[in-house]
């Protein structure tokens, strides 16, 4: 019986070798990589979300938390308002910013300019008696803005001899040009400019400042607007005693 079983077993192994033929080399497998990870993952293998995702998905703050944030913000604003005065912007910086805004970023170029000698006199007056010759007083007397006086007093620049001569030459040319235009309008130039030839007539003609149009143009001087003098005080009338007396007031009806 054992021999029969052995023969049967041998025959079965022989038939199985022809039915189930396995290749000697295993076939090459193709690897497919997905661009995105599969969302159908098990709960145990799924990755944990990032902290940013957790913050984005966080619940909105409650009313209590909003009140706490508002109280903290009000406390910070109160601390900013309670800062000492030394942290505030200095006055000169505020003045500079306001002046820059007023000039629209342009350079300082006033229409009325004072001569170099006048500016030196302003500095001398302010240095000797600063309580008397203040910036408003000097600005009112010389008919310029307080900002111009402030800049003159602030300037410490001292020209050299060559720079001073060139500066005075430019100033004389400027004065000659201005007074030449005023002579054309009938204004008598000062003696300094007449000696320099301003308003001098040529060919035996009469100077224009001696014509009928003389002094028809109003020229402002250094006197204040409140300075008023009566006509009788300008040219006093002297009687036999040598004392000045006022001209009699004659009504207009009698003078006609």
UniProtKB/Swiss-Prot annotation:
Name the gene for this chain.
RRG9
Query: Has the keyword Mitochondrion been applied to this entry?
Result: yes
Q: What is this protein called?
A: Required for respiratory growth protein 9, mitochondrial
Q: Where is the transit peptide?
A: 1-48
The family line of this record is: Belongs to the RRG9 family.
* Superkingdom: Eukaryota
Q: What is the lineage of its organism?
A: Eukaryota, Fungi, Dikarya, Ascomycota, Pezizomycotina
Which locations, inside or outside the cell, does it occupy?
Mitochondrion
Give a GO cellular-component term. mitochondrion
**Swiss-Prot/TrEMBL keywords:** Mitochondrion, Transit peptide
Please list where the region (Disordered) is annotated: 38-65
Which coarse location class describes where this protein primarily resides?
Answer: mitochondrion
* Its biological purpose: Required for respiratory activity and maintenance and expression of the mitochondrial genome.
């Amino acid at each position: 019986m054992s021999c029969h079983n052995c023969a049967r077993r041998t025959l079965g192994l022989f038939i199985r070798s022809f039915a189930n033929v396995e290749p000697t080399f295993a076939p090459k497998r193709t690897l497919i990589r997905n661009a995105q990870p599969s969302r159908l993952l098990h709960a145990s293998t799924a990755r944990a979300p990032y902290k940013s995702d957790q913050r984005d998905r966080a619940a909105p703050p409650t009313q209590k938390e909003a009140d706490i944030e508002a109280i903290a913000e009000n406390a910070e604003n109160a601390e900013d308002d309670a800062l000492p005065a030394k942290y505030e912007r200095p006055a000169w910086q505020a003045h500079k910013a306001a002046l820059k805004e007023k000039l629209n970023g342009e350079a300082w170029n006033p229409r009325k300019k004072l001569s170099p000698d006048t500016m030196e006199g302003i500095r001398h007056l302010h240095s000797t008696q600063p309580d008397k010759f203040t910036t408003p007083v000097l600005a009112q007397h010389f008919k310029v803005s307080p900002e111009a006086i402030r800049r003159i007093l602030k300037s410490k620049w001292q020209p050299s001899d060559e720079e001073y001569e060139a500066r005075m030459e430019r100033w004389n040319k400027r004065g000659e040009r201005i007074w030449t235009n005023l002579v054309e309008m009938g204004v008598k130039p000062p003696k300094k400019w007449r000696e320099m030839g301003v308003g001098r007539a040529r060919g035996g003609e009469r100077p224009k400042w001696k014509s009928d149009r003389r002094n028809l143009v109003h020229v402002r001087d250094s006197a204040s607007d409140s300075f008023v003098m009566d006509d009788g005080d300008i040219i006093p009338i002297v009687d036999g005693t040598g004392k000045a007396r006022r001209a009699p007031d004659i009504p207009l009806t009698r003078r006609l």
